[in-house]
């Protein structure tokens, strides 16, 4: 899904009336239906694949206003894309047991990039509700693609009580064309680590079966602001897995703290 909102103020101390405020919005997302299959090819090795069909609408908005100059009209540019296409994911997983209490799993997933079927438009809005708005809406033939994606993950389980894991994701957005622009995005990377602790799987008390979870991640976004990569993102998550009595269900509760940091 696409969802962001950013603001920037450019101050001109010599000519205050030319100072400008810029706002950037992203909205929309994609829906996905998929069919998957997996096979165990060796004792500890499994492979699988998903093929999916996805569709949806995505809009990117850039708005510029001049707070100190009422005679200069604000300009809003909306770029919209309606997408219908497919996606292929191929993965493999290897699990190794060491003794009675140790288990390690390594997984990898790959998705090739390709061009997407789309209908695109660009809309320019000059003015606002007070001044009146002039709208110029035009369809455009635009190239748009999905990135090559590679993910690698590792997990370790001790005595069925402690699980720790790490994931790394790389998406080659720099090779994706957007609205016929070949250098519209940056490569995206994300690193995530986490742990889950179960006090006593064989315990009789309720608290012995509560799962305690903690995780953190660092992510570099793929989109640019004024030709530069947008702010990096950090996040920390903590939560619990609460077993529901007399069922196999678990109620998961979590909280997340997110911080962005960068020049934009």
PLM feature segments, named:
Residues 1-264:
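Outer-membrane beta-barrel porins/channels
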């Amino acid at each position: 899904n696409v969802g962001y909102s950013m603001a920037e103020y450019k101050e001109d101390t010599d000519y205050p009336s030319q100072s400008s405020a810029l706002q950037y919005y992203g909205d929309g997302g994609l829906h996905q239906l998929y069919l998957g299959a997996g096979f165990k090819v060796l004792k500890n090795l499994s492979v699988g694949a998903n093929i999916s069909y996805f569709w949806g609408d995505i809009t990117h908005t850039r708005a510029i206003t001049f707070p100190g100059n009422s005679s200069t009209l604000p300009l809003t540019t909306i770029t919209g894309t309606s997408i219908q296409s497919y996606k292929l994911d191929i993965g493999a997983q290897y699990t190794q047991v060491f003794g009675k209490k140790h288990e390690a799993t390594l997984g990898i997933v790959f998705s090739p990039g390709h061009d997407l079927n789309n209908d695109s438009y660009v809309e320019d809005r000059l003015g606002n509700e007070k001044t009146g708005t002039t709208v110029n809406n035009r369809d455009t033939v635009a190239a748009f693609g999905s990135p090559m994606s590679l993910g690698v993950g590792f997990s370790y389980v001790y005595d069925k009580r402690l699980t720790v894991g790490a994931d790394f994701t790389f998406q080659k957005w720099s090779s994706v064309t957007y609205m016929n622009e070949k250098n519209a995005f940056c490569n995206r990377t994300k690193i995530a680590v986490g742990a889950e602790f179960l006090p006593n799987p064989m315990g009789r008390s309720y608290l012995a079966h509560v799962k305690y979870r903690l995780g953190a991640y660092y992510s570099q976004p793929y989109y640019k602001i004024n030709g530069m990569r947008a702010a990096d993102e950090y996040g920390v998550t903590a939560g619990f897995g609460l077993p529901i009595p007399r069922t196999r269900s678990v109620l998961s509760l979590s909280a997340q703290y997110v911080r962005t940091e960068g020049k934009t």
